[in-house]
Amino acid sequence: MSLPIARIATISVHTSPLDQPGTGDAGGMNVYIVEIAKRLAARGVEVDIFTRATSRELPPVAELVSGVQVRHVVSGPFEELDKTELAGELCAFTSGVLRAEAAHDPGHYDLLHTHYWLSGQVGWVAKQRWGVPLVHSMHTMAKVKNAALAEGDTPEPAIRVLGEEQVTAGADRLVANTAEEARQLVELYGADPDRVGVVTPGVDLSLFRPRNGLLRGGADQARRRLGLPRDAYLLLFVGRIQPLKAPDVLLRAAALMVEADPALREHLVVAVVGGPSGSGRARPEGLQKLATELGIADLVRFEPPCPQPLLAEWYRAADVTVVPSHNESFGLVAAESQACGTPVVAAAVGGLRTAVRDGESGVLIDGHDPADYAAVLTRLRDEPRRRERLAAGAVRHARTLGWDATVDRLLEVYTGAKDTVNATAAGVLPR
């Protein structure tokens, strides 16, 4: 019988839970770490989140909520350091984490949970020093990303592949967002199936919900707040602007829609809510140039990343949220949109096949041909009753994705990891 888990060290080297999602390297992983930590703390589990300090102005320790502390570790230059360069700073980061733990009595942490391969390298060392279970979440995997690269995207380096293979072999448990990710861990990385736990991410259903229980009425209110026309056909993209997310597919689809029906120009609005992460046309200025070349610059509205309450208003205002990513380990944007009552049109890749129920809460499209997206989006415009059915189905589906259920399952994974370590220490195989 495992002893209760009282304190967890969470490691997120390359992105801080305090960063605004949608900027730089901050995205769904940030939301995941914050939501899990808050809910663990509410259940009496203390969480220390170690992340790299990116400014000398940051305090050594910042309280996120009661029971959750963010610990900033100085390792390398504070600014102008790309994620691809962080592997060279892992020794300094690991040293900082080990020093922080050494300031406490032995056994201060009951478990390590690392996020992304860089953090896994740190956890791999700390696990040996502390004698505690290591649970690791990949969030994305190099072999999967390299098999589905977007045009203009850069392949993940060999050092990342090696790092992921090392943490796969060294972790006591691996957390997969979906059954497909679990299969990829086993088939591509040789993970032990018995050490892979599927934990579906959640949505904050108290925040992401139809306003006052209304679907169309809630959309009207949101559009007034955002200064959007009531009669617009609003297509929404949310996320970091990078090749992987393929926002250009939406712009090209919108151009095809207007070309096929010039009268649509009076009503079509494409909103892109997100910040730069990458280069070329995947940056806002690159997308703006593309919109001009396509002749739809007047239809596209670019908005910076925004706090979650405002983001929920964008979801409510939209007719459809479009997620044309080349790969997603889950697809938090799709889940949030559905929770607000807005159906999703998404690429049938990765975790999006779990996050969206095709034909019930949205539409999944094979491939990334803008013509296919234009056809689906045009049909949804022309069939408002179908949109309404999908909107209702989206809300129903999202209700199965609350964060509390995620934490319930994650605690089961933590317990399994502790049982494995305890059994190994006792010289017996875990049951």
From Swiss-Prot:
This is D-inositol 3-phosphate glycosyltransferase. GO terms for biological process: mycothiol biosynthetic process. Mg(2+) binds at residues 315-316, 318, 342. Its EC number is 2.4.1.250. It comes from Thermomonospora curvata (strain ATCC 19995 / DSM 43183 / JCM 3096 / KCTC 9072 / NBRC 15933 / NCIMB 10081 / Henssen B9). It comes from the Bacteria. GO terms for molecular function: acetylglucosaminyltransferase activity; D-inositol-3-phosphate glycosyltransferase activity; magnesium ion binding. PANTHER family: SULFOQUINOVOSYL TRANSFERASE SQD2.
